[in-house]
Amino acid sequence: MITRIDVTNRFSEVAIYNGIAYFAGQVPTDESKDAYQQTQQVLSEIDKYLAKSNTDKSRILMATVYLANMADYTEMNRAWDEWVAPNNAPPRAAIEARLANPNWKVEIVITAAINHQ
């Protein structure tokens, strides 16, 4: 069975299947912020959906970070390093890409193992 969280007509924020939660790309809530602050916002959204998925950041299996400009890599990493679970940093890729909204500096996609109830 597939469980979907926060479903819209276009996409779900999370789909859970066979013990794995697949997340949609999470984006900043305030486009006026700098890369560090936008990354903090995105990570906060990820925390929210991890909780809704009955899991946490220590169970992230993979993260893909999309940056509008690689010049923001250091500031994104600063926010990431403050947030990531100690001794549980997941595999991660960082890619420069043109994002759907030109004011977004970062978008992050993850997969995570869920906690079985």
UniProtKB/Swiss-Prot annotation:
This protein's superkingdom?
Bacteria
> What is any Pfam family matched here?
Ribonuc_L-PSP
CDD domains reported for this sequence: YjgF_YER057c_UK114_like_2
* UniProt-listed InterPro entries: RidA_CS, RutC-like_sf, YjgF/YER057c/UK114, YoaB-like
Family annotation (PROSITE patterns): UPF0076 (PS01094)
- Similarity comment: Belongs to the RutC family.
Give the protein name, as stated in the record.
RutC family protein HD_0322
Species source reads Haemophilus ducreyi (strain 35000HP / ATCC 700724)
